[in-house]
A protein has these predicted regions:
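Flavin-dependent oxidoreductase catalytic cores
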Residues: 1-217
């Protein structure tokens, strides 16, 4: 099944998720060769790009064979995120993604990744500025919520759609769950019902059968 994200048309709706330490260039090329419609890069700190961190420059490299490719940025400063994306607009990236789902303590302590789900107003500001700063499609990846007292994936998805985001990706666990327990695909369905933009399901997709079942459910 084909999928369109903004003006980027994908061959199919099978997407390689962004995974730090996993989705490097050789892995992405391999996944494209095996039929993935879109591959996502390892998350990159917008601040690290700003400060010209050497390791970060390596993470930004792309091979034409892997396109279309999505560059995932993370950060909590709306201006820095928007300015960095704008500075990379002429680069070999087809989509800009913003990470609002990373559960790692170091990231969360900095108010980045899934910590942003506790601050919908800041989410709105980041996404609004990012969408205005670039012509390429913007997507956002987030979780079911921060914890059981903050299940707000639907609210975040609606904010994203209103800000002009082209698609959202939803992981069916809260930040407090990390990767334990079972991913709640029902929340993905709720988000799908709440917005008109494409919704990408994430979590517990280990086999082709899982992927098929996720789409059906």
């Amino acid at each position: 099944m084909k999928l369109k994200i903004g003006n980027v048309e994908l061959e199919n709706n099978v997407i390689l998720a962004p995974m730090a330490g996993v989705t490097d260039m050789p892995y992405r090329i391999l996944c494209r060769e095996q039929g993935a419609g879109l591959v996502c890069m390892e998350m990159v700190s917008a601040k690290a790009i700003l400060y010209k961190n050497k390791n970060t420059q390596e993470l930004l490299k792309v091979d034409e064979r892997e396109r279309p490719v999505s560059l995932q940025l993370f950060g909590s400063d709306p201006d820095i995120v928007a300015d960095i994306a704008a500075s990379l607009e002429d680069g070999p990236y087809d989509i800009f993604d913003i990470n609002m789902g990373c559960p790692v303590p170091k990231i969360v302590k900095n108010g980045e990744g899934s910590a942003l789900m506790r601050n919908p107003k800041l989410v709105e500001e980041i996404l609004t500025k990012l969408v205005k700063a670039v012509k390429k499609p913007v997507t956002v990846k987030f979780r079911k919520g921060f914890d059981d007292t903050c299940i707000n994936a639907v609210e975040i998805a609606k904010i994203a759609e209103s800000a002009g985001v082209a698609a959202v990706a939803v992981h069916g666990r809260t930040r407090e769950q990390y990767y334990s327990g079972k991913a709640d695909w029902n929340i993905i369905r709720e988000v799908k019902k709440a917005v008109k933009i494409p919704v990408i399901g994430n979590g517990d997709v280990f086999t082709p059968q899982d992927a098929k079942r996720l789409v059906e459910e």
